[in-house]
């Protein structure tokens, strides 16, 4: 490769990435997922588009796809709170194993019939498109405030279901390549256990060693993110090399690092955010370049039928069966989880496997997978806001600062700076600072008014559009949010929870005269205990029950237990 070729590569890459970044603004205006924008830019630059770039190197696509996916999962793991496992771990694992197997089987049967393939070839297509995609799920759910049970289940499922899909894909490729007639089920189960066991063991063990290394090393601040990424990729590669699931390993590594005290945590997350965006852009650009629209047209109708079968039948059946043991999921939550079975880069990367193995019909497998992913992202991704409202799984977004950054003062305490802009309707407007009920251990360190820095004192009265800088901890965010945060554009709070918030510790017998309730059967219970009896354990914000003409909704949680309960009349529409 000469200097001119290298420079041309830099020029084209910079143009494509820059165009993807600038065009990403169209996502919100057109109501389509941002990943579709990146994919479309790649297709337009490809051989059938105005760019005319001929790219058919599947090994490079495999390299870029795996590298990008590893970084995305590392970032996703670091942003997942382990507290969400309280409500979502076992349901997500059920969907990641049983759910993927059922989706593969049902989709494979349809693929064999639609494309006139034998059963094993159809099952290979089912395995390729059988898993949800972490990049798509993290990207599309990141900006939405869904109830914790639903969002955590979808995120953990997408981060842990790839081992099953990879295992099924590799196994079926081996069967087709060697013309095997029978299956050694014991061997297959052993291999599946190896994938999950090594992935989980090395991911957690390697993550713990990486955590100790990061906290003990004395480096320039900018080097800690590089150490984190390189360590995560090392764990990913080592796990894959010995037959485990590198994808699961790096997700668990990120999960462990994100839930422990980590040196330069804020800087690392900031760098990872940029790398994740670059990974998504690069991965979908390459996959878009790899696709040839003229090759998709001949299989468009059967591929569309397969996508519809998977979205409307295979995925819902797998979700309903996978979640059968878990009674906490309401039918509307099951329906939403069924609908958000987003396919993304993983199926396309898995479709590269048959190409590299030289299987017959390999191009067909790739084209079908690409078409299914495109339909999934456009149809399911674009309808996500509407689906969340119809399923009533969207809850009012918790108040949050307009900016936050870490203070590397004490590794164990994890101090942060939170920036708040005061809106006119906040109750603290006009109040002196001495009257604010600040959370213990927090301090207002700066106040900006009309672009000027003021020295705040106890007698300073707050005004609309003041900007406050507060030092505190992550655990202080709920209380600070109630004091200072900008109200959302559409305040769902009163309409969703009701005008009255009651203490979960309130006795039912005390509430009876206020609301005209017959509490003879629950007179000895608190309101929180009553809801737990009605809805089961592991409650989340947004859980609700209709009882005696009123709707009772969990409004706040504290340490896994309800703290505040909203109450409203049934005729009030929360949406």
UniProtKB/Swiss-Prot annotation:
Topology with respect to the bilayer: Multi-pass membrane protein
Organism listed in the record: Aeromonas salmonicida (strain A449)
UniProt function note: K(+)/H(+) antiporter that extrudes potassium in exchange for external protons and maintains the internal concentration of potassium under toxic levels.
GO cellular component, one term: plasma membrane
Descriptive protein name: K(+)/H(+) antiporter NhaP2
Gene: nhaP2
Organism phylogeny: Bacteria, Pseudomonadati, Pseudomonadota, Gammaproteobacteria, Aeromonadales
TM region positions: 3-23, 30-50, 53-73, 95-115, 122-142, 185-205, 232-252, 271-291, 304-324, 335-355, 364-384
Primary subcellular site in the record, as a coarse category: membrane
SMART domains found in the cross-reference section: CorC_HlyC
Domain RCK C-terminal, residue spans: 404-486
Entry annotated with the keyword Transmembrane: yes
GO molecular function: flavin adenine dinucleotide binding; potassium:proton antiporter activity
Reactions accelerated catalytically: K(+)(in) + H(+)(out) = K(+)(out) + H(+)(in)
Localization: Cell inner membrane
Entries under InterPro entries matching the protein: Cation/H_exchanger_TM, FAD-bd_PCMH-like_sf, FAD-bd_PCMH_sub2, Na+/solute_symporter_sf, NhaP2, RCK_C, RCK_C_sf, Transptr-assoc_dom
Pfam families reported in the protein's UniProt record: CorC_HlyC, Na_H_Exchanger, TrkA_C
Keywords annotated in UniProt: Antiport, Cell inner membrane, Cell membrane, Ion transport, Membrane, Potassium, Potassium transport, Transmembrane, Transmembrane helix, Transport
A biological process from GO: cell volume homeostasis
Family under the similarity heading: Belongs to the monovalent cation:proton antiporter 1 (CPA1) transporter (TC 2.A.36) family. NhaP2 subfamily.
């Amino acid at each position: 490769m000469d200097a001119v070729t290298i420079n041309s590569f830099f020029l084209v890459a910079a143009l494509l990435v820059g165009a993807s970044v600038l065009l990403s603004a169209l996502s919100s205006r057109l109501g389509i997922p941002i990943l579709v924008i990146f994919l479309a830019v790649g297709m337009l630059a490809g051989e059938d588009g105005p760019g005319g770039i001929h790219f058919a190197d599947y090994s490079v696509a495999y390299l870029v796809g795996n590298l990008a996916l590893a970084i995305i999962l590392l970032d996703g793991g670091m942003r997942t709170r382990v507290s969400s496992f309280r409500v979502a771990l076992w349901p997500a694992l059920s969907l990641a194993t049983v759910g993927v197997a059922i989706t593969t089987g049902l989709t494979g049967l349809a693929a064999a019939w639609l494309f006139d393939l034998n059963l094993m070839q159809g099952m290979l297509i089912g395995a390729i498109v059988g898993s949800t995609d972490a990049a798509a799920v993290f990207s599309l759910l990141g900006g939405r405030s869904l109830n914790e049970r639903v969002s955590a289940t979808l995120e953990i499922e997408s981060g842990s279901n790839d081992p099953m899909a990879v295992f099924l894909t590799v196994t079926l490729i081996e069967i087709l390549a060697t013309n095997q007639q029978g299956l050694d089920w014991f061997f297959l189960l052993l291999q599946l256990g190896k994938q999950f066991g090594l992935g989980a063991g090395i991911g957690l063990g390697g993550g713990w060693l990486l955590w100790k290394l990061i906290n003990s090393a004395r480096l320039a601040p900018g080097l800690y993110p590089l150490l984190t990424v390189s360590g995560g990729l090392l764990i990913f590669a080592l796990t894959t090399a010995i037959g485990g699931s590198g994808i699961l390993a790096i997700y668990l590594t990120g999960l462990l690092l994100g839930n422990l005290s980590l040196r330069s945590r804020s800087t690392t997350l900031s760098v990872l955010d940029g790398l994740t965006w670059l990974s998504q852009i690069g991965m979908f650009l390459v996959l878009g370049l790899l696709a040839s629209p003229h090759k998709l047209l001949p299989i468009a109708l059967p591929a569309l039928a397969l996508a519809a079968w998977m979205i409307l039948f295979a995925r819902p059946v797998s979700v309903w069966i996978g979640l059968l043991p878990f009674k906490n999921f309401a039918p509307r939550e099951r329906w939403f989880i069924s609908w958000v079975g987003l396919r993304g880069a993983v199926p396309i990367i898995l479709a590269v496997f048959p190409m590299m193995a030289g299987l017959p019909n390999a191009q067909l497998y790739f084209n079908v997978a690409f078409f299914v992913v495109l339909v999934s992202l456009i149809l399911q991704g674009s309808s996500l806001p509407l689906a969340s409202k119809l399923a009533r799984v969207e809850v009012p977004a918790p108040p949050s600062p307009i900016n936050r950054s870490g203070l590397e003062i004490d590794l164990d305490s994890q101090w942060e700076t939170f920036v708040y802009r005061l809106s006119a309707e906040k109750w603290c407007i006009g109040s002196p600072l001495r009257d604010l009920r600040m959370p213990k251990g927090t301090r207002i360190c700066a106040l900006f008014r009309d672009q000027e820095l003021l020295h705040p004192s106890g007698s300073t009265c707050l005004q609309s559009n003041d900007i406050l800088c507060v030092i505190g901890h992550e655990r202080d965010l709920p209380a600070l949010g109630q004091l200072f945060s900008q109200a959302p554009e559409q305040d769902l709070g009163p309409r969703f929870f009701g005008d009255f918030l009651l203490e979960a510790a309130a006795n039912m017998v005390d509430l009876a005269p206020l609301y005209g309730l017959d509490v003879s059967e629950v007179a000895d219970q608190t309101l929180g205990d009553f809801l737990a009896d009605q809805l089961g354990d592991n409650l989340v914000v947004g859980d609700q029950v209709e009882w005696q003409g009123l709707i009772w909704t969990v409004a706040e949680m504290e340490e896994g237990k309800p703290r505040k309960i909203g109450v409203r009349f049934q005729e009030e529409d929360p949406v």
